[in-house]
UniProtKB/Swiss-Prot annotation:
Keywords: Coiled coil, Membrane, Metal-binding, Repeat, Transferase, Transmembrane, Transmembrane helix, Ubl conjugation pathway, Zinc, Zinc-finger
Region (Disordered): 115-137, 167-236, 284-366, 415-487, 549-576
Annotated organism of origin: Dictyostelium discoideum
Protein name: E3 ubiquitin-protein ligase DDB_G0292642
Sequence ranges of Polar residues compositional bias: 415-427
Pathway(s) this gene product operates in, as recorded in its UniProt entry: Protein modification; protein ubiquitination
Substrates-to-products reaction catalysed: [E2 ubiquitin-conjugating enzyme]-S-ubiquitinyl-L-cysteine + [acceptor protein]-L-lysine = [E2 ubiquitin-conjugating enzyme]-L-cysteine + [acceptor protein]-N(6)-ubiquitinyl-L-lysine
UniProt EC number: 2.3.2.31
Length: 903
């Protein structure tokens, strides 16, 4: 019951809920992990430090994170074209993968997560210690927790490019490792075994039927012995499986003595890189601490036969390793090597001439692609990668560099770690072939060629081996087998599910930047179509190869790619590189898509003429050019003008939750990638804003009270009421919505403001109810969300702007196509534009023109009365004032004349 509730809770996670859910579970795990890392006795395991209830919680939180990870993959599929959300989801995947990997390492749940310690072998001891037994006899050293539980990206994986290059440079400068690759032929006397000579060079020269030439450098005997011992242990199946897996470098603690045995000192493995993987496949072990010489050889094995490869040992301790059999098949030569082998068998040339011919052939070799195939439990596995033709001397380093710099972009599917053992290869024929353009090691089942049984009986002779090589070359010249899968290193769960469910035909293409962008857009647009028509449920394997042609890439972009790759490698967990299981696009390709998405505006579509004209379902016009129409995921075709206008209307009205196909009988939603392609920048910004508002309606949020800030803030409670706006950095109260008043309750001013708000709300509610009662024929509630809708004129087909529900205004039933022409609704028949009858109780408002005339008449009457009464008064008053002025003037003049006469 709890699991069902958990699945329901995870399925209900939206874009805004997934991040807090992950943060909460990681915070809970933080306390448990800290307890597991507390110092204690060395014989106490990490899981024994927790109580029973704490262990139960640890398992529950782990299950939650695993289910949340699958939910995030679904969200990535939905938001494949959204840059910010996509980057955020990829970061969450990195954190979840790191914490799950750490928990598996500490609890020891997964067998592949256990690291084994290479035992030390004495010169006088003839028995080699079993790695599987030694791995279970001791505990690991307790490592202090790193900052993987913080919000920043963790640095758990050590196999980044910078650390790899620095490690290789340090080893080269200190140990001066030299590598010499030689290839010789196989005669009838040898037993297809690889042997190394002792420090005395005469042992190899005097050996009968010797067919391998190995150059070794003179170093200290003790150091060479220790390096050979490390090679033996790492060459075993157990250590090879641990070396191939994408796991962090975990040092091992010095265990206590068990059964009187001396504990093995601590030893650190070299972190996994592409070089390590290729060396493990080719049989090259670079874990020695002294200068050694590496030899790469080729062997041919018939059906039912096992190659016995003996590791290098300076003390001739080869007979003790017969129980640890494993196959190493590799080839780095051109087709001329095979011809040189035939000439040697016929002419009996010496080994020196053979080495000279091989060196000359290497100089003329121009490889374009390197492919290797291996088999685990009868399943063919294949890896392909690009190598530089100018660097034949170090193809493995070039392969690692090209892989790490993103030179070969591929769809990766997780498969189990390879264990190259003959025990897992019953009834198989392993043949190494070489061509001028491709070097491939193929593994074919026994049923492919019926003559393999006859040839295996005479496999000791060189003639039969040469014939096997020729037949295999002829078979390889044909089309590739569709039952091949691309080799991937990592966790085994996903590969098993994929191999049991799907089989994809081989798809191999080279893309430019523009073509890669279009392919990813197609993947994001039609994943369901791919799953229906491209994936077929059969018991087989799958290969989906996407090679990225970087011929147009500039050198200045390499640093950015290195930074992106280092982030992806450092954040990868037990699955290697995190993949998107829904449609098989890995994170590197997603980051490339984010980068190339910005170039979409400048991309010009090439117009091609269609075989048949296509009719638009909106304007019913026919179009014969491909750039004039657009096909939705539901296969409905519309012209660009109609579908663009349809999206513009929906976005402008805020109906972002109901953007679906315009066809009346189709309700399939239009994806964000299609909306982005069909809208301009202005409408796209509106769509994003309205989508955010629609998602925030379901969240417990508070809006910032700052006038110039419209930021929603989530969180807050009665105990912690203070919220901080991330935009304006102002604190406000979660309870009253006013500015922060920390240390005191909401004051009287806030309470008075709340009282005024309540009064205004009550008065507004009363007025609204009165309005509804008086206009009940023009205002009706939505049948779904009960939001009131007012209608005065127009069509009776209504759409609620709040919930996007479509209904009939007359009968209030859900609207369907042909509603007003159906006999099921007789009251609505042929009444699509019918207006209801308005009763006599309704009094329409008076016309506005009449009111204006009355006001104008009043003004004219008032002005006329004022002028009639005021004009006489003004005339009389003016005459009186004039008479008074004249009288004063005469009186003053008479006074002046009288005064002049007196004097």
């Amino acid at each position: 019951m709890a699991s069902v509730e958990l699945e329901q809770q995870v399925d209900d996670l939206t874009v805004s809920k997934v991040t807090p859910f992950v943060e909460k579970n990681i915070d809970e795990l933080n306390s448990l992990v800290q307890l597991m890392f507390t110092p204690s006795a060395p014989d106490i395991h990490c899981t024994q430090k927790l109580s029973k209830s704490q262990n139960t919680k640890l398992i529950q939180y782990k299950i939650r994170l695993e289910k949340t990870r699958s939910r995030i993959l679904v969200l990535i599929d939905n938001y494949i074209t959204h840059e910010e959300k996509l980057s955020h989801f990829l970061g969450l995947l990195d954190r979840i993968d790191d914490i799950l990997t750490t928990i598996k390492i500490m609890s020891g749940e997964d067998e592949e997560l256990n690291f084994t310690l290479p035992p030390t072998t004495n010169n006088n001891n003839n028995n080699t210690t079993n790695v599987l037994e030694s791995s279970s006899d001791s505990d690991y050293d307790i490592i202090q927790p790193r900052e993987f539980l913080k919000k920043s990206k963790p640095n758990l994986i050590l196999s980044t490019k910078n650390s790899l290059s620095s490690l290789l440079k340090r080893k080269k400068s200190k140990n001066q490792i030299t590598t010499t690759t030689t290839t010789t032929t196989t005669t009838a006397n040898n037993n297809n075994t690889r042997r190394n000579r002792n420090n005395n060079n005469n042992n190899n020269n005097n050996a009968n039927g010797a067919n391998r030439t190995i150059d070794t450098s003179s170093e200290d005997d003790d150091e060479s012995i220790s390096s050979s011992d490390d090679d033996i242990v790492i060459g075993s199946r157990r250590s090879r499986a641990a070396t191939i897996s994408y796991l962090p470098n975990v040092p091992r603690a010095n265990p206590t003595p068990i059964n009187g045995r001396t504990p093995t000192p601590s030893h650190n493995f070299e972190p996994f890189t592409i070089n390590t993987f290729l060396n493990s496949v080719n049989g090259v072990n670079k874990t020695s601490t002294t200068s050694t010489t590496t030899t790469t050889t080729t062997t041919t094995t018939a059906a039912g036969r096992t190659n016995k490869t003996v590791n290098r040992n300076n003390n001739n301790n080869n007979n003790n390793n017969n129980n640890k059999r494993f196959e190493i098949e590799s080839e780095e030569e051109s087709e001329t090597d095979i011809s040189s082998e035939e000439e040697e068998n016929n002419n009996n040339n010496n080994n020196n001439s053979n080495n000279n011919n091989n060196s000359n052939n290497n100089n003329n070799l121009k490889l374009k692609t390197k492919s290797m195939s291996f088999t685990k439990n009868g399943i063919p596995l294949k890896i392909r990668s690009r190598i530089n033709s100018e660097s034949e001397s170090e193809p493995e380093n070039q392969l690692a560099e090209s892989y790490e710099l993103g030179k070969c972009q591929r769809k990766h599917i997780s498969t189990p770690s390879l264990r190259l053992s003959s025990a897992h290869l019953p009834n198989t024929t392993t043949t190494t072939t070489t061509t001028t353009t491709t070097t491939t090691t193929t593994t074919s089942p026994k049923s492919v060629n019926n003559n393999d049984d006859d040839e295996s009986s005479d496999s000791d002779s060189s003639d039969s081996e040469i014939e096997n090589i020729k037949q295999t070359i002829k078979k390889n010249n044909g089309p590739p087998s569709p039952m091949t899968t691309e080799i991937i290193i990592g966790y085994s769960g996903h590969s098993k599910r994929l191999c049991n469910r799907y089989s994809l035909p081989t798809v191999q293409k080279s893309f430019t930047k523009q073509q890669l962008h279009e392919e990813i857009i197609n993947f994001g647009r039609t994943p369901s179509r791919i799953k229906q028509s491209f994936l077929k449920p059969v018991n087989g394997d799958a290969e989906l190869v996407f090679e990225y042609d970087d011929s147009e890439e500039e050198e200045e972009e390499e640093e950015e790619e290195e930074g992106e790759e280092s982030d992806s490698e450092s954040s990868s967990g037990s699955e290697g590189e995190v993949i998107v299981e829904s449609f098989g696009i890995e994170k590197k390709v997603l980051r490339q898509y984010i980068k190339l998405k910005k170039e979409m505006e400048d991309r010009k579509k090439v117009s091609t003429k269609l075989e048949e004209p296509v009719e638009c379902k909106i304007c019913y016009m026919e179009y014969d050019q491909s750039n004039e129409v657009f096909t939705l995921e539901c296969d409905h075709v519309y012209c660009f003008d109609c579908i663009t206008e349809h999206l513009r209307i929906l976005i402008t009205e805020g109906r972002v939750l109901d953007i679906s196909c315009p066809h009346p009988q189709c309700k399939k939603e239009i994806k964000e990638s299609e909306i982005y392609m069909l809208t301009n920048e202005k409408n796209w910004l509106k769509y994003q804003k309205f989508s955010m508002i629609a998602s925030l309606k379901t969240e417990p949020i508070k809006w910032c009270p700052t006038p110039d800030c419209d930021t929603p803030v989530r969180g807050g409670s009665e105990r912690n009421p203070i919220l901080n706006c991330p935009k304006c950095s102002n604190d406000f109260c979660w309870i009253c919505g006013e500015y922060s008043h920390e240390g005191a309750k909401c004051g009287t001013e806030a309470m008075e403001l709340q009282g005024r708000k309540n009064k205004s709300i009550e008065s507004a509610a009363t007025a609204y109810i009165d309005f509804l009662e008086s206009n009940k024929h023009f205002v009706k509630p939505c049948p779904t969300c009960k939001s009131h809708i007012e209608k005065h004129d127009g069509c009776n087909h209504m759409t609620c702007i709040n919930c996007q529900h479509q209904f009939c205004w007359l009968c209030m039933n859900p609207y369907q196509s042909g509603h007003y022409s159906s006999n099921e609704y007789p009251e609505c028949f042929d009444r699509q534009y019918y207006s209801p009858f308005v009763p006599d109780t309704y009094t329409p408002p008076p016309p506005r023109r009449r009111h204006r005339k009355l006001k104008m008449a009043k003004k004219i009457t008032l002005y006329t009365a004022a002028f009639t009464v005021g004009a006489p008064l003004l005339l009389i008053g003016g005459a009186v004032l004039l008479c008074v002025k004249i009288h004063k003037h005469r009186k003053n003049r008479a006074r002046r004349n009288r005064n002049v006469g007196l004097y």
